[in-house]
Amino acid sequence: MKNILLIATGGTIACSSSDEGLTPSANVNELLSYIPHIKGKCKLSGISIMNIDSTNMNPELMMNIAKTIKEYKDDYDGFVVAHGTDTMSYTAAALVYMLNNFYKPVVITGSQLPMEAEYTDAKKNLSDAVIYACEGRAGVYVAFDGCIINGAHARKVKTRSYDAFESVNYPVVAHIKHSRITHNEAVQGDYNKSDNSGIEPELCSDVMLIKLFPGIDNKIFEFIKGHYKGCLLYTSPSPRDYAAS
């Protein structure tokens, strides 16, 4: 039986109603109590390393998640990260590169509704994440609404619907329905990595993201040059010389 660690970070999945609206309050043991049926599929334990609204996620906290996985890498067969949806895709992409060549599965999930809500998607999403972590396929994934998405290609596209995430420029890796996994045979991944030499839980936050638009003032690049180590350009897909000009 596989040994899986749930790493709780907060988010809607751990929220409860208060006078100030939804606030992260449920601890990791409470999350585990909502999916008792999973106990027959694996040995599941949990740890809470933060309890935040994911809009407050930042590179340092992302590194804390990676460091936690590195700390427990020899004790568990797979990892599930409970996370808020607003910044889940950022954390997933960051973990893909910080955990490069990591030989165990890391599955990130969350929900559109709190675990305690009547029609919550939290129970299914968390269950699906654990089920896929038990598969033992190395890599970082997002589990949401029955879809398993490569962590580097997940993007939130809806704010209210259960199918909040899509896979961008890459096929969905697998689907889960009634606890059964259907793998996408078109996806050929390196699922059998054998070492952890690629774990580097470090990020450089001195990077600016700029969305190019017609008429952008080039002075902004002079500012970036003096204050940042790098710049990512969000530009049109064509023509290619648009960004170069």
Predicted features along the sequence, with ranges:
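ATP/NTP phosphate-donor binding region
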Residues: 1-70
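Short Gly/Thr/Asp-enriched flexible loops that form oxyanion-binding sites at enzyme active sites
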Residues: 82-103
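Short acidic, glycine-rich surface-loop motifs adjacent to enzyme active sites
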Residues: 76-88, 227-236
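Short beta-strand segments
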Residues: 7-9, 81-83, 107-110, 141-146, ...
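Single conserved hydrophobic/aromatic residue that forms the stacking wall/gate
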Residues: 234-244
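Gly/Ser/Thr-rich loops at beta-strand to alpha-helix junctions
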Residues: 11-13, 84-89, 147-149, 240
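Accessory alpha-helical/coil subdomains and C-terminal extensions
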Residues: 7-8, 34-35, 152-230
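Internal gly/pro-rich beta-alpha loop/helix module
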Residues: 109-176
